[in-house]
């Protein structure tokens, strides 16, 4: 399985606020063009939810349904695909305090389920996933930059 980690720092937003925005899946389509649709079912007895996603992916759309498990005290969300276009898609979001705001870490493991083309397709899918996560975070949180790097100065 291909592993992807994206760490971005959101400027001027505290971790609790960032976590609440990232947890509010229903708002994604109105805040970023990358996510075309999200349907969230009512919470299950254990607090997890099932959500159905339609996301722009290169020149097409990827669709999947996932189980999302929220950990507000840790400001983290774990997800696992239940069905959809990936063979496997699972990972997490985490929000941590940073002197200038919040560092958001997105981790995912995925398998497109086409072993004979994995060497060609996986790097493209990884790049697209990284770009999509950055666009999603910009839409949700505003100014973001790769963790550890300062945003570009304009003047």
PLM-predicted stretches and their roles:
Residues 109-132:
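A short acidic/glycine-rich loop-to-helix N-cap element
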Residues 24-27, 100, 125, 129, ...:
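Amphipathic alpha-helical protein-protein interaction surfaces
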Residues 29-33, 37-44, 54-103, 109-111, ...:
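Hydrophobic-ligand binding "helix-grip"
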Residues 1-46, 154-155:
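Hydrophobic ligand-binding cavity/cleft-lining segments
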Residues 49-51:
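Short, well-structured hydrophobic secondary-structure segments
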Residues 14-20, 128-132, 136:
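Short amphipathic alpha-helical segments
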Residues 3, 13, 80, 118-125:
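Residue-level detector of alpha-helix boundaries and kinks
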């Amino acid at each position: 399985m291909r592993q992807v980690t994206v760490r971005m720092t959101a400027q001027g937003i505290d971790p609790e606020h960032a976590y609440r925005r990232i947890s509010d899946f229903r708002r994604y389509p109105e805040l970023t063009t990358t996510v075309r649709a999200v349907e969230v079912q009512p919470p299950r007895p254990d607090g997890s939810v099932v959500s159905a996603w339609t996301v722009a992916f290169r020149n097409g759309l990827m669709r999947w349904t996932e189980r999302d498990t929220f950990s507000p005290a840790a400001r983290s969300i774990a997800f696992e695909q239940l069905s959809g276009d990936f063979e496997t898609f699972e990972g997490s979001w985490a929000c941590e305090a940073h002197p200038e705001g919040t560092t958001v870490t997105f981790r995912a493991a995925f398998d497109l389920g086409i072993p004979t083309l994995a060497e060609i397709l996986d790097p493209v899918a990884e790049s697209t996933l990284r770009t999509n996560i950055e666009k999603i975070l910009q839409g949700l949180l505003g100014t973001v930059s790769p963790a550890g790097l300062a945003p570009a100065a304009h003047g």
